[in-house]
Amino acid sequence: MMDFQLKVQKPLKELVYLELKHKILTGEIASQTRLMEIDLSEKMNVSRTPIREAIRRLADDGLVMIEPRRGAYVANISIKDMLDVFEVREDLEGFVAQLASQRITAEQKAELTKIATEYELAIRKPNKERIIELDEKFHNYIVECCNNETLSELIHYVQELSLRFRYLYYDDFSHYESTAGQHINIMKAINEGRTAEARAEADAHVKALKEFVYELGKKMETIDDVE
């Protein structure tokens, strides 16, 4: 049974939206699950109005489908969807790393080093949720170092799609071991102001992830969908 816990700092409709979104992104509410307003309002102890508004927002995000007769349900995310995301990430993340290497402060360098080190330590005690949390934190912090709100908004949506895919498919912990080394290389290039290398390392990181997803598609026998 799903456990919903709403924090009180934000408007109720925003809290409902964020809670449902989190559960979809982390796979707690699985693909194809129907989202019943009555059921959700009872579980979350709220009226149907914020539930309805949240479902509409999630549909705008592409996380929920709304169809006549069938109603609202959680959208699928396929290997092809993820490869499409990586096509975007290939250009964006290289630029992000390049810009971060030019703008990062001394304090931010220390924090980025800390996050990369925490990730490296986390993979020694495989905990999927913790590893994914630190992976997301690493990439988000590099964006923060760019001090560019427009760029932050652009990449936020792309990273959210990646987050959902991680929870659904990333069960091979050997993949995370190689990712840790890539994070260290990116971090060092950014911290040392090696702009071209920062971009190259970030590009290589995304290409490695894209290859991992492509090979995963082969294993799942969905290769026709990704070519």
Where are these regions (language model features)?
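Short alpha-helical transmembrane interface motifs in multi-pass membrane proteins
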Residues: 78-79, 165-169
